[in-house]
Amino acid sequence: MLAGRAARTCALLALCLLGSRAQDFGPTRFICTSVPVDADMCAASVAAGGAEELRSNVLQLRETVLQQKETILSQKETIRELTTKLGRCESQSTLDAGPGEARSGGGRKQPGSGKNTMGDLSRTPASETLSQLGQTLQSLKTRLENLEQYSRLNSSSQTNSLKDLLQSKIDDLERQVLSRVNTLEEGKGGPKNDTEERAKIESALTSLHQRISELEKGQKDNRPGDKFQLTFPLRTNYMYAKVKKSLPEMYAFTVCMWLKSSAAPGVGTPFSYAVPGQANELVLIEWGNNPMEILINDKVAKLPFVINDGKWHHICVTWTTRDGVWEAYQDGTQGGNGENLAPYHPIKPQGVLVLGQEQDTLGGGFDATQAFVGELAHFNIWDRKLTPGEVYNLATCSSKALSGNVIAWAESQIEIFGGATKWTFEACRQIN
C-alpha cells in the first residue's frame, strides 16, 4: 500500500510540474521530492522550480547585456569608418575646388541680407558641410560611449527593449548616412545636387539624434532632475528647447548657465525671451564677429565673454532696473560692468523663453545664422542680483550653490524640438 501511495505521489507531482512549466519551450524534467503525506505537493514543486527559473532569468539578462555591449562597440566602429570617409571627402572637395572657389560661399550672412534657413543650404561649401557632419558624428560617438558606460554600471536594469532599439533604430539610420557619404565620395554633383544631398544627410542625422535620445531616456529615470545638459549639434533654424514656465515681472535679475562651444564666428544665441510686442525683451547672443551681447527691451550692452574654445565655462549676468546697472561674470570672476542698460524698464511677464534660438516673433521666427551651436546646462534665473560670493559658489559647484527661484534647471521643465537632445551631465565632474 505504501508503494502505491508513493507512485500516486510521484504521478501527481509530475502533473503539477507539467502545469507550472507549461510556458517553457525547452525539455521538461521530472523531479520526485519527498514530502509529508498531508502537504500540498503542487506548492512544493513550484517552490523547487522557482530557484531554477531565477537562475535562468539571471543568465538570460547577462547574455542580453553582453549583446548590448557588442552592439554598441559595433556602432562605434561604424561611426569611426564614417568619420574616415568624411575626412577623405573633405580632402577631395578641397583639392577639386579651383583657386577662386576655395572660400566662396563661406561668408557669414550680414544683417539685412535675408535669413539663412534650410532652403538656403547651398550657401555653405561642401568642405564646411563635411566638417560639420564629422563633428556631429564625433558627438554621436561620445554619446554612444556614454550609453556603453551606463550599460556597464547599471547592467542589472537593462532590458531587451534597449537592445532592440540599438539594433533596429541605429542600424537603419547609419545605413542611410553611409549611403549619403558614399554618394558624395563617388560623384561631383552640381549646386542643386549638393543642396539635396546635404538636406538628406542632415535629415538622417537629425533622426539619428532623436533616436539615440530615445535610448538615453533609459538614463533619465535613474538620474536627478537637474543632472542633464542640452546639446545643439548643428546650426539650424529648427533645433531648440523651450522652457515651460514664463517669467514674472522683474525689476532685477541674475541669469547663469554652463556653456560649451567651439562654433565660429559667434556661438549664437544661448537663450532669448520674447513678449507680445517685443521679441528682444531679454536676449543673450554672440552673432558673427561681434562680441557677446545682452539685450533688454532691444537695448544692448557688450559683454567681455570669451567662450568658444570648446571648453565648459560658467557665465552669469546680473541687472537692476535702477540706472540699468549690470555685471558680467565668467568662471566665477567679474569681468565687466556698466549702467544705463534699459533703466527703469521692468522685464515684462507672460513671454516665451527659448534656449538655442533668437526669436524674431513670439515663440518663432528663428534665423539659422543666430542659432546656438554647442552644449548648455544649469540654466537658472533669479529675480534679484546675486552677490559675487553666490556667483562664485555656482561656478565652483559649491554645496552652498543656489537654484534659481524664478527658473530652476529641471528636466521636467524643458521641452526639446528639432533634434536637440538631453543627456546626463554633472557640473565639475565632466568639465574640461
Curated annotation (Swiss-Prot):
Residues 226-428 form the Pentraxin (PTX) domain. Cerebellum, hippocampus and cerebral cortex. GO terms for biological process: axonogenesis involved in innervation; cellular response to glucose stimulus; cellular response to potassium ion; mitochondrial fragmentation involved in apoptotic process; mitochondrial transport; neurotransmitter receptor localization to postsynaptic specialization membrane; postsynaptic density assembly. Disulfide bonds join C256-C316. Glycans are attached at N154, N193. Residues 90-128 are annotated as: Disordered. Glycosylated. It is found in: Secreted; Cytoplasmic vesicle, Secretory vesicle; Endoplasmic reticulum. This is Neuronal pentraxin-1. It comes from Rattus norvegicus (Rat).
